Amino acid sequence: MARVKTGVVRRRRHKKVLKLARGFYSGRRKHFRKAKEQLERSLVYAYRDRRRKKRDFRRLWIVRINAACRLNDLSYSRFINGLKKAGIELDRKILADLAMNDSAAFAKIAEAAKKAL
């Protein structure tokens, strides 16, 4: 029986890795081993940062809400407590958007939160 080499399989595997490595710099794009190493690292970063993104946005929303609350003579924690007591169920993403783009509506929500305290 004849010996089977990995020519076609190897070429396909290399092409797949090099295709995913497009956009990398220098040898990390052209050389298979470096491309494979960088690709593994890149996938780890992507996995980690998909989770970190959620935390980062939540922190950003809280900073924006806090800044708008301070303009309405409230702290962030008292504002959130007032919302819970008033039964207003808006998430932080929506509240941050209102704080940035519609300050009049946010001021009304802040007043409702103050009354509930």
Curated annotation (Swiss-Prot):
| HAMAP family given in the database record | Ribosomal_bL20
In the UniProt record, the gene name given for this protein reads: rplT
Q: Which GO terms describe its molecular function?
A: rRNA binding; structural constituent of ribosome
What name appears for this protein in its UniProt entry? Large ribosomal subunit protein bL20
What's the superkingdom here?
Bacteria
Offer a single GO CC term for the protein: ribosome
Which keywords label this protein? Ribonucleoprotein, Ribosomal protein, RNA-binding, rRNA-binding
For this protein's source organism, the top of the classification is: Bacteria, Pseudomonadati, Campylobacterota, Epsilonproteobacteria, Campylobacterales
Output the GO biological process annotations, alphabetical, semicolon-separated.
ribosomal large subunit assembly; translation
What is this protein's function per UniProt?
Binds directly to 23S ribosomal RNA and is necessary for the in vitro assembly process of the 50S ribosomal subunit. It is not involved in the protein synthesizing functions of that subunit.
Could you say which protein family the record assigns here?
Belongs to the bacterial ribosomal protein bL20 family.
Native species of this protein? Answer: Campylobacter jejuni subsp. jejuni serotype O:6 (strain 81116 / NCTC 11828)
Keyword rRNA-binding part of the UniProt annotation:
yes
